[in-house]
Amino acid sequence: MSRQIIFGPPGTGKTTHLLRIVEKELRENKVSPNKIAYLAFTNQAADEALSRAISQLNYSTKDFMNFRTLHSLAYRELHLKEENIMSDEDYRVVSDKLQINLSNPNKNTETYGAGFPDDVFMKVIDGAKVRGLTTENFFHDPTVGHLEGGWLKLKYIDTALSQYKTERNKFDLTDLIVEFNKKHYDTVPHFDVVIIDEAQDLSWLQWKMVERIIENSKRVYVAGDDDQAIYRWAGARPEYLINMEGQNEELYRNV
């Protein structure tokens, strides 16, 4: 497996560069478009890459079926349906049962690639998962701060929420990646080419998913800008990008 790490600050044409890689793989290496995965942190980046690829390379959306976010890929590979995803109504039911107002982190995750729950309890529960920690361990992290009711209240909420999901086969978007990472090696999709965009913003949990995907791939391109890691507070681990082994390439602004 070959691996190339591409550092591209804003204004260096990173997306254009990545699409040239796609074109080269299609034209020169004769890779089928459905064997190319372009995986981004946010919907915006995935949608932009897909739109430009279709326009520039004369293919259809169906051809580039693997231009998507990590959450979207996990959702598809787990063979889930919309009713399996925790909705506002699900959180309302749990909130009413516990007499505690819990927010739905899914909306932010779909837009920004990370969940930003409005209430402190969901922040800790989701934050623990993306960091690969137990809820109790993350609760004691100095960055968490004071929670009214302390660990016992948080444990009560976490247990009730987990039970609700298990009984109804429900998942939030972070759970999708947790479950994907449990898949057996043989059931993880195999790609000829994998492109990871916005890698500086990936959490520990998302990096584990990326590692499983690239194990089954022939050529890997990981792109990002460690200076633009704006989601450290939400669990982003840009050091994984910096320390990744492979051939490094740095893009520069045209002057």
Each model region followed by its residue ranges:
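Short, surface-exposed alpha-helical segments at coil->helix boundaries
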Residues: 47-50, 174, 238
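Conserved helicase motor core of SF1/SF2 NTP-dependent helicases
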Residues: 9-12, 20, 41-43, 200-255
